[in-house]
Design a protein with these regions (language model features):
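Conserved Nudix-box catalytic region and its N-terminal flanking loop in Nudix hydrolases
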Residues: 20-61
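Conserved beta-strand and immediately adjacent loop positions that scaffold enzyme active sites
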Residues: 11, 37, 111
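Conserved N-terminal beta-strand and adjoining loop/helix that marks the start
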Residues: 1-22, 41, 45
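Hydrophobic (often cysteine-bearing) scaffold residues that line and stabilize catalytic clefts
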Residues: 6, 51, 127, 131
């Protein structure tokens, strides 16, 4: 019997200076969540760390560009059945960071995927479930 895990994650919808989404093409490696899928930059929260501190740290580690905490806008929270790993549970906080200069990034995990907003739907089948959740919240916020 496989023991279920509870993950605590913070990730960001990152938008460049031209309004494009900066997404992570995840490595095709056994053992990582949503291997080969398109994800958001972010990751696991460390003990004693707030979700905002987590997203600042994780995004910096993964894209090599520091985004100050006051530049992150909270998008949506999720707490329930794991979106990306069957049988697990998760709490995830999603943020938005805007006006990020794509030419200053140095992606260290996976590869950078720059997507025009009107092309995102064509990648729907490649998006990790957590990305679909965050993008639906983002689209809903744009309509409000």
């Amino acid at each position: 019997m496989v023991k279920s895990r509870h993950r605590e994650i913070a990730s960001a919808v990152i938008i460049d200076t031209q309004g494009r989404f900066l997404l992570q093409q995840r490595d095709q490696v056994p053992g990582i969540a949503q291997s080969g899928k398109i994800g958001l930059f972010g990751g696991h929260r460390e003990v004693g760390e707030t979700y905002l501190e987590c997203v600042v740290r994780e995004v910096y580690e993964e894209i090599g560009y520091f985004i100050a905490s006051d530049r992150f806008e909270h998008l949506v929270s999720y707490n329930g059945t794991e979106l990306d790993i069957d049988g697990d549970t998760m709490r995830s906080e999603f943020f938005i960071a805007r006006d990020i200069p794509v030419d200053e990034l140095n992606v260290t995990e996976g590869s950078l995927l720059v997507v025009e907003p009107d092309k995102l739907a064509t990648l729907e089948h490649k998006l990790a479930p957590s990305v679909r959740f965050a993008m639906q919240a983002f689209e809903g916020r744009k309509r409000d």
